[in-house]
């Protein structure tokens, strides 16, 4: 931390002083890393196979059944008892902790779907026979990636729009405010429902639609910061010296505005994850079969006789959002100079 400026060192000290937010950041980082490595934790393929003095990495490469002594050239099914016996007789395999992928079905269970937690399925199976824990891992990754990308794109658009309005003011600011007022009044959910009847919704399609109608969150903050700083003496001096508007905006004014927007980012990320979860719960989100926390919540509602579905999905969403809220509160305290360490 010695490389940080005194101001940033004080901010970091205030952030660490908020123990709840500080440890929430570490827990969130661990959960994020685990979700990014979902294939190494939950997969229906082994990590490494040693078969007849040859090495195979099924988690990275697709092999055929004939590679393991089978009669067909179709992709190997590593859950097939025959193939597992072949590997056991002529070599060995290293498996991941959870031997089910996002769309794997446990055909070996003796109970109807959704089946309760067991030694094979630690959190049980869903209504389609998928492992709940595996789908939570993959669903968390999709939710986090969606939330991060939505936060990034919408923040960039909001910062640019707010900077232009705040710097130039006048008619540009007036017309910009009126456009934002009209645009923010659009019924986003109904538009998504309408478009879902025309095209098949997907990850990038949903991301584009939500960015299109969700970029206004930071406009007001950035606009107010630019309206405040554009009258400073050093800004007027730069204008008098002939410095270009772009250089003034991005080099001299934007760093001050970014500080004000950083405190909002964890809450925007929280809202982005909630948006995808809500759309999936309503049936207008990711394609059918995609691992999703919202879809798992919907299954919990439709299968009240299987409480592990709703409980697991609810706790996953609640923990994720709570961590982000705690982090956001700590970031807000860190950038508040009136907070004592």
Labelled PLM ranges:
Residues 1-155, 159, 163-164, 289, ...:
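Gly/Trp-centered helix-boundary motif
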Residues 125-341:
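Alpha-helical transmembrane segments of integral membrane proteins
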């Amino acid at each position: 931390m010695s490389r940080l400026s005194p101001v940033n060192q004080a901010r970091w000290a205030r952030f660490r002083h908020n123990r709840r937010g500080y440890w929430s950041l570490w827990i969130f980082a661990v959960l994020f890393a685990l979700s990014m490595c979902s294939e190494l934790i939950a997969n229906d393929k082994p990590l490494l196979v040693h078969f007849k003095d040859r090495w195979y990495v099924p988690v990275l490469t697709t092999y055929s059944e004939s590679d393991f002594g089978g009669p067909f050239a179709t992709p190997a099914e590593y859950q097939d008892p025959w193939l597992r016996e072949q590997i056991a007789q002529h070599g060995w395999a290293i498996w991941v902790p959870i031997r089910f992928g996002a769309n794997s079905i446990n055909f070996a269970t003796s109970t109807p779907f959704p089946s309760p937690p067991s030694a094979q399925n630690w959190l049980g199976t869903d209504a389609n026979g998928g492992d709940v824990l595996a789908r939570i891992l993959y669903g968390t990754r999709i939710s986090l990636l969606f939330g991060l990308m939505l936060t990034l794109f919408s923040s960039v658009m909001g910062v640019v729009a707010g900077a232009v309005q705040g710097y130039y003011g006048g008619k540009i600011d007036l017309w910009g405010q009126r456009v934002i007022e009209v645009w923010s009044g659009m019924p986003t959910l109904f538009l998504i429902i309408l478009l879902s009847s025309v095209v098949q919704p997907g990850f990038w399609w949903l991301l584009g639609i939500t960015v299109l109608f969700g970029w206004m969150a930071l406009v007001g903050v950035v606009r107010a910061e630019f309206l405040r700083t554009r009258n400073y003496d050093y800004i007027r001096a730069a204008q008098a010296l002939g410095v270009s508007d772009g250089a003034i905006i991005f080099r001299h004014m934007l760093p001050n505005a970014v500080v004000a927007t950083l405190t909002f980012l964890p809450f925007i990320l929280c809202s982005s994850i909630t948006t995808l979860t809500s759309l999936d719960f309503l049936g207008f989100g990711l394609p059918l079969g995609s691992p999703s926390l919202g879809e798992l919540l919907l299954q919990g509602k439709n299968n009240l006789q299987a409480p592990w579905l709703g409980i697991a999905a609810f706790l996953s969403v609640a923990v994720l959002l709570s961590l982000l809220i705690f982090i956001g509160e700590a970031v807000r305290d860190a950038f508040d100079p009136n907070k004592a360490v």
